Swiss-Prot record:
Its EC number is 2.7.2.3. Monomer. Belongs to the phosphoglycerate kinase family. It comes from Ruegeria pomeroyi (strain ATCC 700808 / DSM 15171 / DSS-3). ATP binds at residues 201, 323, 353-356. Pathway: Carbohydrate degradation; glycolysis; pyruvate from D-glyceraldehyde 3-phosphate: step 2/5. It catalyses: (2R)-3-phosphoglycerate + ATP = (2R)-3-phospho-glyceroyl phosphate + ADP. This is Phosphoglycerate kinase.
Length: 398
């Protein structure tokens, strides 16, 4: 794919600067979700096993170029030591004499964590001088933070031009999964796009209709498309001012040979709350006081049938109000169908986005998907067809 991995590098005795995403939630000094740290473990273990000395570069929160104690990475040292099962040292800067001294003194089997890169205001400006200061700490640069790859920052883009560079295991897995999904996918390809607003996913929809065979639209977005087709949506969440744009997307999809799938029947309630009284109606029968909160059983059957004839699935966004029972039914059932097909070796399934990950976890389907991205903005920008600076830098370095 044009970029190098850890397998292409001689790591013996080398100081390996690893750009990581350890932007984890902390409450009262306690890490409440260590998923991002756990996902780094293969990279750190492989570097240590090959005789390399990992030096971690990371941002934490948005300090705006100021040193803020509550955003210091030093508080993560105990959590990292437990995860990596080795000694983790800490330097109170990511450049300068103290950081250079700590990097030079790092012993085999140890890990060095550098202070928050965003304590330097120039980090987010892709400052080459800051990148040069970081590069002095290592012999090799390894980017394992796909979640930050859509940002051209000193620690993600500029530094890759200054050292031999490669992708870490997490970055490698993410890029390989995404290449399978949209780069050179097995066809037919289906995309599921849900969520509240068409306006926030215009570029995404525009890119997908050129690349996929079926585009399943759910959530509040689907209501806007129903409005564009002249169908009633009552008091449902819908962007009525976007109906002309939605109509244009429908026309472009038809011209591109992409079949857009909208709900043929809907689950309607008068209140947006769990277990609200509801009814299943055809998509042309939503009453004035009704709110569409989920796709109906006929719609779900159609989605399952499309999954069965697909070879690749990309999923971003729920099909309904998944946070409210029973309006999570279509999302859960579709997710479990995709999981079963993946388990049977009949489907490559890739999903990403905050609500998507939450919905798939809630359904119990997440563990069977081929790949689930926790990268958020980077995953969306990749789906939109944009060039990610952090990835482009690795390709150029390769």
């Amino acid at each position: 794919m044009g970029w190098k991995t850890l397998d292409d590098m001689d790591l013996t005795g080398k100081r390996v600067l690893v750009r990581v995403d350890i932007n984890v939630p902390i409450v009262d000094g306690v890490v409440t979700d260590s998923t991002r740290i756990r996902r780094l473990m293969p990279t750190i273990r492989d570097i240590l096993a090959a005789g390399g000395r990992p030096i971690l570069l990371a941002h934490f929160g948005r300090p705006g170029g100021e040193r803020r104690k509550n955003l210091s990475l030093g508080q993560l040292v105990p959590t990292l030591e437990r995860a990596f099962e080795t000694k983790v040292l800490f330097a109170d800067d990511c450049v300068g004499p103290a950081a250079e001294e700590a990097a030079e003194a790092l012993q085999p089997g140890q890990v060095l964590l550098l202070e928050n890169t965003r304590f330097h205001a120039s980090e987010t400006k892709n400052d080459p001088d800051l990148a040069a200061g970081m590069a002095r700490l290592g012999d090799i640069y390894c980017n394992d933070a796909f979640s930050a790859a859509h940002r051209a920052h000193s620690s993600t883009e500029a530094i890759a031009r200054l050292l031999p560079s490669c992708a870490g295991r997490l970055m490698q897995a993410e890029l390989e999964a995404l290449e399978k999904a949209l780069g050179k996918p097995e066809r037919p390809v289906t995309a599921v796009v849900g969520g509240a607003k068409v306006s926030t996913k215009l570029e995404l929809l525009g890119n997908l209709i050129e690349k996929v065979d079926y585009l399943v639209i759910g959530g509040g977005m689907a209501n806007t498309f129903l409005v564009a087709k002249g169908l009633p949506v009552g008091k449902s969440l819908a962007e009525r001012i976007m109906k002309d744009t939605a109509a244009e997307i429908l026309a472009k999809a038809e011209a591109a040979g992409c079949t857009i799938v909208l709900p043929s029947d809907v689950v309607v309630a008068e209140k947006f709350e769990s277990h609200a009284p509801h009814q299943i109606l055809p998509n042309d029968r939503c009453p004035d006081e009704g709110m569409i909160l989920d796709a109906g059983p006929d719609s779900l059957a159609a989605i399952k049938a499309i999954f069965e004839k697909s070879r690749t699935l990309i999923w971003n966004g729920p099909l309904g109000a998944f946070e409210l029972e029973p309006f999570d039914a279509a999302t859960n059932a579709a997710a479990l169908k995709a999981a079963a097909l993946t388990r049977a070796g009949k489907l490559i399934s890739v999903a990403g986005g905050g609500d998507t990950v939450a919905a798939l976890n809630a359904s119990g389907a997440a563990g069977d998907f081929t790949y689930i991205s926790t990268a958020g903005g980077a995953f969306l920008e990749w789906m939109e067809g944009k060039t990610l600076p952090g990835v482009a830098a690795l390709i150029q370095a390769g």
